[in-house]
Curated annotation (Swiss-Prot):
This is Probable potassium transport system protein Kup. GO terms for molecular function: potassium ion transmembrane transporter activity; symporter activity. It is a multi-pass membrane protein. The gene is kup. Keywords: Cell membrane, Ion transport, Membrane, Potassium, Potassium transport, Symport, Transmembrane, Transmembrane helix, Transport.
Length: 657
């Protein structure tokens, strides 16, 4: 683990390009739609004044400075969990401070996943709509939005299709492409800004405050909803910390910010130069980003912006896989199949999530049809995530012994700022924002059902001391009249106590059909707060035939149980804790480990269960969701092992622990 961390912290040309390709896709494509959204929302080009433009630029500059630079880059990036970032990594650092902290973690994670469904749709659509300005495109298709939609659907479908094969090869071009993209943004901005340097006055916060109360601002306070789009990628920047390291973000962010600001200022200069151009007044959804390009550069501009949009979408898709994977390991989300299409660290693929994201993105494009309509829905959910991150960050600062007044100032300042953006974005609800809210609520409901169902079951399950059955297990082990069921018989237990297991496990061994084995294993898997922990403790109860294993794995470690267990068995044999398990017939010389059989207990709710109506609904809902999840055999990597599934009635409410 230390090697991985040190390698990503190195500052090289390669790490510089990787950071550009991985971290800044979302925030880097914001110039495609931020100014467009604000200008069209204020009544179009004809309603623009110099004071309005200065105010907008000032709002964008200070939003990026306060939220992205100060909150995320300078403060939040320091809240890393062994080099890993993101809202769930932050939660694992502080979850022992208070149980209620799971609420902002779940709410923030749900909203971030909802944002991941909107981002690919809005960025790709915004870039492809640039084709409408091309004379050759207009001559053939005119102002036909259906053609734009078809192209967007093809690109998105292709992007989701290739996830199955991994993106390691094409991922190598992400960095160079984003380098060209940011250079393009800067050059385009400088060319249009030259001669309009008075716009640099917008760096003063005076203009940001003034525009909120100016009669030239037809949106009033709600202009912040459009301005916020310039910083939506800040949360993704924190989530990708583990891929590139803090030092690489410190190095690249100032350069990225300068490129973005130069482009925003260039767009502003073009807007002021064209505000009296009546020919542009009738253009629907005027986009300054494409309009300020010379005609000979338009095709390249559309191509490079589309590539940047695809890279931004890829980053959000990969981020969604990672986010769901972490939620699963923290028992906040149902277990779904995880595949590893490449050898790169952190490269995972989740087929179910990929299908859901693809269907959601396609549905969003078909429902909203244009980037204008999508922008109306975009940004609302991410403000919620930022607010939740601020709450978790406050608790992290207190844990790190930050003086309470300083921690409170940070919490109040950034929460007030983010709450202002949330209120200003709330106007988007009826214009399409309800879509992201509904998506977030669906995800949150699944999380709530899953974790609440777990707590209900854990509080009512019947646990028993293993030592009470030591003699019976010894007699069963030595009962030669019974055929040997397995050399090593393995059960998974949820009990974290070293001397207790669920009664249903002992019932399976002794009552259902007595199972004779040389060694009985009771394995409890605990997910730790650190990302890459891999350690275990054992309790043999003074025997060589009963072992309770507590396997501690980091929240980013694959839970391949057979691999870990075989290693543990070998170590216990070498230490003399259990006997050598010689096999009479084997193709391997000197093999001293016998066969394994895993018993997986499948629970179904019994009609005898006595639960309150709400708890009963939760448990039944969880069991229903469980039908669509990956089997324990696949989750724990036991597909090639000998397993047996036993159905056991889940009787809850009659016995308390």
């Amino acid at each position: 683990m230390s090697t991985n961390k040190s390698s990503i912290e190195k500052i090289t040309l390669g790490s510089f390009l990787i950071a550009l390709g991985v971290v800044y896709g979302d925030i880097g494509t914001s110039p495609l739609y931020v100014m467009k959204s604000i200008i069209n929302g204020n009544g179009g080009l004809e309603s623009i004044t110099p004071d309005f433009i200065l105010g907008v630029l000032s709002l964008i500059f200070w939003t990026m400075t306060l939220l992205t630079t100060i909150k995320y880059v300078l403060i939040t990036l320091k809240a890393d969990n062994k080099g890993e970032g993101g809202i769930f990594s932050l939660y694992t650092l502080i979850r022992r401070r208070a149980k209620w902290l799971i609420i902002p973690a779940m709410v923030g994670g749900s909203a971030l996943l909802a944002d991941g469904m909107l981002t690919p749709a809005v960025t790709v659509t915004s870039s492809i709509e640039g084709l409408k300005i091309l004379p050759s495109f207009n001559d053939i298709f005119g102002n036909n939005q259906d053609i734009i939609i078809i192209i967007v659907l093809v690109i998105l479908s292709f992007l989701f299709f290739i996830q199955h094969f991994g993106t390691e090869i094409i991922g190598k071009i992400f960095g160079p492409v984003m380098f060209i993209w940011f250079a393009f943004l800067a050059i385009l901005g400088i060319v249009n800004l030259s001669g309009n340097l008075y716009l640099l006055k917008a760096l003063s916060p005076h203009y940001a405050i003034k525009i909120l109360f100016s009669p030239n601002n037809h949106l009033g306070f709600f202009i912040l909803g459009g301005v916020f789009l310039s910083t939506t990628g800040a949360e993704a920047l924190y989530s990708d910390l583990g891929h590139v390291g803090r030092k690489n973000i410190y190095l690249t962010w100032p350069l990225v910010k300068i490129c973005l600001l130069l482009n925003y200022f260039g767009q502003a200069a073009w807007i002021l130069s064209q505000k009296n151009n009546a020919k542009l007044y009738g253009i629907e959804s005027l986009n300054p980003f494409f309009q300020m390009m010379p005609s000979w550069l338009l095709l390249f501009g559309v191509l490079i912006s589309t590539l940047a949009a695809i890279i931004a979408s890829q980053a959000l898709i990969s981020g969604s896989y990672t986010l769901v994977s972490e939620a699963i390991k923290l028992n906040l989300f149902p277990r779904l199949q995880c595949l590893y299409p490449s050898n790169s660290k952190g490269q995972i693929y989740m087929p179910a999530i990929n299908r859901i994201l693809w269907i959601a993105c396609i549905a969003i494009v078909l429902y909203f049809r244009s980037s204008d309509n999508m922008e109306a829905a975009y940004g609302l959910s991410i403000t919620v995530t930022m607010l939740m991150t601020s709450i978790l960050l406050f608790n992290y600062l207190l844990k790190r012994k930050t003086p309470l007044p300083i921690a409170l100032i940070i919490l109040v300042f950034f929460s007030s700022l983010e709450f202002s953006f949330l209120i200003s974005s709330a106007v988007k609800f009826e214009k399409g924002g309800f879509v992201s809210v509904l998506i977030a609520l669906c995800i949150l409901s699944i999380m709530y059902i899953w974790i609440k169902g777990h707590y209900i079951k854990m509080s009512l399950l019947d646990y028993i001391p293993i030592e009470n059955y030591k003699n019976q297990l010894k007699e069963l082990k030595n009962d030669v009249d019974r055929p040997k069921y397995a050399t090593n018989l393995v059960y998974l237990t949820s009990s974290e106590k070293s001397k207790r297991i669920e009664r249903k496990i002992m019932y399976s061994i002794l009552d259902k059909r007595p199972k004779r084995a040389d060694v009985y294993w009771f394995v409890n898997v605990i997910v730790t707060d650190e990302p890459y922990t891999s350690e275990y403790t054992v309790n043999t109860f003074g025997t060589d035939y009963m072992v309770k294993v507590q396997l501690k794995l980091g929240f980013r470690v694959n839970q391949k149980l057979n691999v870990f267990l075989r290693q543990i068995v070998c170590e216990l044999i070498n230490n003399g804790d259990i006997k050598v398990q010689n096999k009479k017939y084997t193709t391997l010389h000197n093999r001293n480990v016998g066969d394994f059989r895993f018993i997986l207990i499948n629970e179904c709710l019994s009609s005898e269960s006595k639960l309150e109506s709400w708890n009963s609904i939760i448990i039944r809902s969880k069991l229903f969701i469980k039908k669509f999840t990956v089997s324990p055999a696949k989750w724990f990597g036991l597909e090639s092992s000998e397993i047996e599934v036993e159905n056991v009635p889940l009787i809850l409410g009659s016995t308390r622990m």
